[in-house]
Amino acid sequence: MPKPRTKRQAIRDERKKKRRETHEETHEENHDERQSKRRRVDGEDRDEDEDTQQQTYNDAGDHPQPFHGNGPEKEFFGMLADEEQEYFRRADELLELNQFPSPEERHVFLQNVYKEARGKELKLASSQSLSRLMERLILLSNTRQKKQIFNAFAGHFLSLVQHRFASHCCEKLFLESAPIVTQELGGIVPETEGNYDEMEVEEDAEPDNTMENLFLMTLDEFEEHMGFLLTDRFGSHTLRVLLVILSGRPLDDSSTKLLLKSKKKEYISVQGATGASDELTHQLRAVPESFTQATKKIIQDAVAGMDFTALRVLAKHPTGNPLLQLLLELDISLNHKSDKSSAAASKDTLLYRLLPDAPASLADETSQAADFVNSMVYDQIGSRLLETLITNCPGKVFKALSHNFFGDRIATYVRNDIASYPALRVLNRFSKDDLVEAVKKIIPVVPLLVSKARYNVLKTLFERCDARGAYEEKSALTRALTDALGPNPKDLVPKLCHLVEDESADKDQFQQSPQNKTAVAAHGCHLVSTMLKTPGNASKVAQKSLVALPPDLLVKLATTAMASTTVLTTALASPAAPQNEFFHKALVGALAPHAAELAQSQFGHNVINAIVEIPSRGTDRCVPFHVKQTIIASLAGHERALRDSWMGRSVWRTWKGDMWKTRRSDWVKWAKEVDGPAEETKLKPWERRKLEQQKGPQPRQPPRETAKEDKE
């Protein structure tokens, strides 16, 4: 939000005045009708009534009251007539079914729906049953139509983002409009489809504004209420979406989706929606300088007027904490990494407000910064903010944190269910020397970690030791883990992956839920997969334990869950450990008799697909070619059953079963392509001589000295 915005504000004030006059003229005429309709549909759309919505909000118990009192007054946009509701419900059903006789009729139908929706956008967005239609219209709209929806929502965004259903429409509008900002910034004007030109043009239509200005004018409406939106149930989520757009982050990145997704949000889609290109959604987007300034302004306004105590309360607020994490990450990125000099001189950034006088103050146990870290590390909600702080803070602040808090107490933190997660973030940033010291302190508590199923701690230690080159510590961790699991090292995979039930553990944890058991088994499978990818004793022990499994447990491992299947696919893709050269041959040989069964499994078919990629000859990993022939013959014997499921069809395509049936020699050549150049070096002398004759005589190169003389 740049300071010179008087022209935008004047346009906004004029629009507000026009809407206010129109609203006052029609308010008295529609008052009685609106009240009757609200009473009639109160049981169906009760969330549209503010009192009922607030009551539901309080009774839920999941979301506390807003952080800054009651906040601004919410608007009621009225309700549609019965005929209009029926028309739009029918239109929503037709768009979802997409059973139009021809594309032309679909375009005509959409054109009529857009015409009918003009002037009713606010009512549609705030309707429980019709907000889905509004989201579909946003997905189908072109650039000019998105700008028209922006103008229809203008002046009411503050109320819309606090609404249960309208907030989703705002988020969809922001996300779909974000790539247009980048296109306009590069001088690319997105084309509008000619099918909608007739209904777009109006006599009194205002000239098109840039999407950048539309976003900035939307932010102007939130400027005085940032503190309230931090903890609003729906507004905080919409503000997260806006911050992601302003920062230029990838919209379809996995971390971004995790930040923006809602557990209760229904995924809305529609056939024929024209999405943005992958470059504008999967990569960093170019954003104008005004967006960067607006992000800094939001960070300042959001925590303006909050003292240290208020920030601590906000850090433990279930609704405000995720947004505070994003604000802190953007604050460090914009103020401490991009502009280090001004950040050091200002000391008024969000980082320094959470950790006053850092890094020097972190050495003082009585300081506010030290008190903040100690109060967050064991808090279920506050520890998430501490994770973000540890991951993104500057190096000098991290050194002070690790030296004064985590260095000596790392073994204590990793044993705790909550404090272990900030400790893992610290381990990811440790240098080799600090990591070696941390491993020495954690090794004595490995049996306790195994008994508590803290497998993610051990997984992180193996990964970081491999990345930092701490080979002795990897071997020590492997010995400590195998000793903690029992005297027999071959029990590593069955116990970590929970392939066998431990009666003693069941007695101690008789109240453990099935979901918790599945999650613990998944963490154990991830640990085994990490060990298989780690060269040295870790992979050697894991491979020996895997080969020692009986066939029934191997099949169970391949078919239980995706995490357990990953153990086998990782083992097949990893090189054999020293003194275990026949690992792949033994593993595939045990799986081959069950190939047809695994090929029809939801998870097991991935294992069969991974076998075909293993070469028949090689030093690191190989499977004899006759074993592959045995597997394809077994699959061909169950071809009819394989074709009845998508898993079986996937395996049949991957193994090229049709080629094996009709062109056996071509299949043999294809199956040996993965062997690479090693196949040519193993040729017999007469085969190599025949190959040279086919290539023809090659011209001899002149000696180097003769070539120089010719040039002279």
UniProtKB/Swiss-Prot annotation:
Biased composition range(s): Basic residues: 1-20
**Pfam families attached to this UniProt entry:** PUF_NOP9
**Alphabetized SMART domains for the sequence:** Pumilio
- Recorded GO terms, molecular function? RNA binding
This entry carries the following GO cellular component terms, namely: 90S preribosome; nucleolus; preribosome, small subunit precursor
UniProt biased composition (Basic and acidic residues): 21-35, 673-693, 702-712
What keywords are annotated for this sequence in UniProt? Nucleus, Repeat, Ribosome biogenesis, rRNA processing
Residue pairs linked by disulfide bridges in the UniProt entry: none
What is the top-level taxon of the source organism?
Answer: Eukaryota
Residue ranges, annotated region (Disordered): 1-75, 673-712
The function of this protein is:
RNA-binding nucleolar protein required for pre-rRNA processing. Involved in production of 18S rRNA and assembly of small ribosomal subunit.
State the PANTHER family in the record.
NUCLEOLAR PROTEIN 9
Name of the protein described by the UniProt record: Nucleolar protein 9
